[in-house]
From Swiss-Prot:
Naturally occurring in which organism (per UniProt): Galerina sp
Function comment: Lignin degradation and detoxification of lignin-derived products. Demethylates eucalyptus hard wood lignin. Has high activity against the non-phenolic heterocyclic compound ABTS, and lower activity against the phenolic substrates syringic acid, caffeic acid, syringaldazine, vanillic acid, catechol and levodihydroxyphenylalanine.
Protein name as annotated: Laccase-1
Family: Belongs to the multicopper oxidase family.
Cofactor binding note: Binds 4 Cu cations per monomer.
Activity modulation comment: Strongly inhibited by sodium azide, sodium cyanide, Li(+), Sn(+), Hg(2+), and the disulfide-reducing agents beta-mercaptoethanol, dithiothreitol and thioglycolic acid. Moderately inhibited by Mn(2+) and Fe(2+), inhibition by these metal ions is stronger at 0.1 mM than at 1 mM. Moderately inhibited by Cu(2+).
EC category: oxidoreductase
E.C. code: 1.10.3.2
Stated pH dependence: Optimum pH is 3.0 with ABTS as substrate, activity decreases sharply as pH increases, and no activity is seen at pH 7.0. Optimum pH is 4.0 with syringic acid as substrate, 5.0 with caffeic acid, syringaldazine, vanillic acid or catechol as substrate, and 6.0 with levodihydroxyphenylalanine as substrate. Inactive after 3 hours incubation at pH 2.0, retains 20% of its activity after 24 hours at pH 3.0 and 90% of its activity after 24 hours at pH 9.0.
Temperature-activity profile: Optimum temperature is 60 degrees Celsius. Shows 50% of its maximal activity at 20 degrees Celsius. Has a half-life of 53 minutes at 50 degrees Celsius, 23 minutes at 60 degrees Celsius, and less than 2 minutes at 70 degrees Celsius.
One GO process term, biological-process aspect: lignin catabolic process
Places the protein is found: Secreted
Further information: On the 2D-gel the determined pI of this protein is: 4, its MW is: 64 kDa.
């Protein structure tokens, strides 16, 4: 997704914490 991951610091699929879990 367009949101930046808060943990990894890269573009996430969902954004925020959710992205970190998916990655």
């Amino acid at each position: 997704g367009p949101s930046t991951d808060l943990v990894i610091g890269n573009k996430g699929f969902d954004g925020g914490i959710d992205s970190a879990i998916l990655r």
